[in-house]
A protein has these predicted regions:
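Short, Lys/Arg-enriched, Trp-marked, Pro/Gly-tolerant hinge/linker segments that flank
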Residues: 116, 124-139, 146-171
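Double-stranded beta-helix
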Residues: 78-100
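A general structural signal for short secondary-structure boundary/capping elements
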Residues: 96-100, 117-124
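Generic protein-terminus/edge-of-domain signal
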Residues: 1-44, 50, 57, 65, ...
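Ligand-binding loop in jelly-roll beta-barrel domains
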Residues: 56-84
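DNA-recognition element of transcription regulators
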Residues: 52-53, 139
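Hydrophobic alpha-helical core bundles mediating ligand binding, dimerization, or RNAP-core interactions
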Residues: 71, 101, 105-108, 138-149
Length: 171
């Protein structure tokens, strides 16, 4: 279940007091930088950085006062053990993951009858009718995003400069 999808530009002095809830949430910085508290640790996130908040973890976010940051924030329920991969990690997204997030935002605009730039909005009403398949596409893009991250960080691809020599098949 997806609870919220937001894409917004904070003011350079924005401060969100913090919250905790019983579902997952992640923040990805599209531009600028923010300071994020999760539990007792504080981290500065810059463009391309991604951080997950596990269920019931207190977290807040504050603009650092420089460039007004643009953030993608998505909260969702997932009880799969694979989610433990994201505990206490700071990740950087690649171009594929950036495109998947962009696709989620596009589908959210087709699906939800509200602005995506209100960080305090809790309930996201559906459009009546929404674009065919928009909710399913959001779910698929989010699953693809999570799987891609786990695969990329678990099994980094090493590119060889030379292809190994092989004998042609014998006929």
């Amino acid at each position: 279940k997806i609870f919220s999808i937001h894409y917004f530009e904070y003011m350079s002095n924005f401060s969100f007091a913090g919250e905790s809830h019983n579902f997952w949430e992640f923040i990805c910085v599209d531009k600028g930088e923010v300071g994020v508290t999760r539990g007792k640790s504080y981290t500065i996130l810059k463009k391309g950085d991604l951080i997950f908040h596990k269920p019931n973890e207190f977290h807040d976010v504050k603009a650092t006062g420089g460039i007004a940051p643009n953030l993608v924030v998505i909260s969702f329920e997932c009880n799969d053990d694979a989610m433990y991969f994201f505990n206490d990690r700071l990740l950087q997204i690649d171009e594929t993951e950036r495109n998947l997030l962009a696709n989620i935002i596009i589908e959210a605009r087709r699906c939800f009858d509200c602005r995506l730039d209100d960080p305090y909005l809790q309930n996201m009403p559906l459009k009546d009718p929404d674009t065919f398949g928009a909710q399913q596409m959001i779910k698929l893009y989010l699953e693809h995003f999570l799987i891609h991250l786990i695969r990329r960080y678990s099994n980094p691809i090493v590119l060889s400069k030379k292809l190994p020599k092989a004998d042609p098949p014998k006929v």
